[in-house]
């Protein structure tokens, strides 16, 4: 074992690429985010931990598209798309591939500066971009799960989402 935390060690033992996989599993268990056969788009997917969980949960009949600026190592049953989800071209490529999604997830984080308010504002911007992308991709009754750093921009974003 390493000196890392429990979830880091567990992720490595169980083959997940990131400890955040457990956050998504817990969310799915409490909110019923995924269903068998769902189509899922994972925005800001690298290194792929959330895509791995989505793949497990939707099964072989489901579709998972992982989108990121960075290259994502292949994941069985997951289609990767390298691109910037804030670009219209990337969103159009996703829509051409799947039509509509049942679930959009985003674990995007900004490049950290160490300045809390700036990092929180950048996180909120990425969350808003994920929300706007989800509006284009989600079918009726679709779900969005997005990670965001707590800050002054969370409340206005939450209001817009509701």
Predicted regions located by residue number:
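S-adenosyl-L-methionine
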Residues: 70-113
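Conserved class I S-adenosyl-L-methionine
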Residues: 35-46
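Glycine-rich helix-loop-beta junction characteristic of Rossmann-like nucleotide cofactor-binding loops
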Residues: 29-36, 56-57, 98, 136
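Conserved SAM-binding loop and adjacent beta-strand
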Residues: 10-29
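C-terminal substrate-binding/active-site "lid" region of AdoMet-derived donor-dependent transferases
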Residues: 41, 76, 116-120, 124-162
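Conserved SAM-binding motif I beta-strand of class I
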Residues: 63-68
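Conserved SAM-binding loop of SAM-dependent methyltransferases across substrates and taxa
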Residues: 47-60
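Glycine-centered, small-residue-biased loops immediately flanking beta-strands
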Residues: 38, 62, 142
């Amino acid at each position: 074992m390493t000196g890392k935390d429990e979830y880091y060690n567990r992720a490595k033992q169980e083959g997940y690429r990131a400890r955040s996989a457990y956050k998504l599993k817990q969310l799915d268990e409490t909110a019923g985010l995924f269903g068998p056969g769902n189509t899922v788009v994972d925005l800001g997917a690298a290194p792929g931990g959330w895509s791995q969980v989505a793949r497990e949960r939707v099964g072989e009949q489901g579709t998972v598209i992982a989108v990121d600026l960075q290259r994502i190592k292949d994941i069985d049953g997951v289609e990767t798309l390298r691109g910037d989800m804030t670009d219209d071209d990337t969103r159009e490529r996703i829509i051409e591939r799947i039509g509509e999604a049942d679930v959009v997830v985003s674990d995007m984080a900004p490049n950290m500066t160490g300045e809390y308010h700036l990092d929180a504002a950048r996180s909120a911007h990425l969350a808003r971009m994920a929300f706007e992308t989800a509006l284009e991709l989600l079918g009726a009754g679709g779900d969005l799960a997005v990670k965001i750093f707590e800050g002054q921009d969370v409340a206005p974003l939450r209001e817009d989402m509701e």
